[in-house]
């Protein structure tokens, strides 16, 4: 599955079921740009097992505030609508895969 862009208005419905890795990012963030290809690879690797979502914190401040996102990129793993893990800053693919695997 391709990466899905989510907003404040559709965030909750997108995380309700299954495992989701949400990338809280912004267009001006260098490390956010660096992690983008890693997330694209993960989206392919985890197709059918977990979904990768992206939320622009500048355009969607309510959701970012709700989950206390202070630094970006912040990646939060949700399982059936509940946050179960959080990673802040650029991470290599192997680290993110390890985090996802814990919740599958």
UniProtKB/Swiss-Prot annotation:
Key words, A-Z: Disulfide bond, Electron transport, Redox-active center, Transport
All copies of domain Thioredoxin, residue ranges: 2-104
Record-level GO cellular component terms: cytosol
Name of the protein described by the UniProt record: Thioredoxin
SUPFAM superfamilies: Thioredoxin-like (SSF52833)
Record-level GO BP terms: cell redox homeostasis
One MF term in the entry's GO annotations: protein-disulfide reductase activity
Homology family: Belongs to the thioredoxin family.
Main function: Component of the thioredoxin-thioredoxin reductase system. Participates in various redox reactions through the reversible oxidation of its active center dithiol to a disulfide and catalyzes dithiol-disulfide exchange reactions.
Cystine bridges: 29-32
Keyword Electron transport: yes
Domain of life: Bacteria
Gene that this polypeptide is encoded by: trxA
């Amino acid at each position: 599955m391709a990466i899905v862009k989510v907003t404040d208005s559709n965030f909750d419905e997108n995380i309700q079921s299954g495992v989701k890795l949400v990338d809280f990012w912004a267009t001006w963030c260098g490390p956010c740009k660096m992690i983008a290809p890693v997330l694209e690879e993960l989206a392919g690797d985890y197709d059918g097992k977990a979904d990768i979502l992206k939320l622009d914190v500048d355009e969607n401040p309510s959701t970012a505030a709700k989950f206390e996102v202070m630094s970006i990129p912040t990646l939060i793993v949700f399982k059936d609508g509940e946050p179960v893990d959080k990673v802040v800053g650029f991470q290599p693919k192997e680290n993110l895969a390890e985090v996802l695997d814990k919740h599958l």
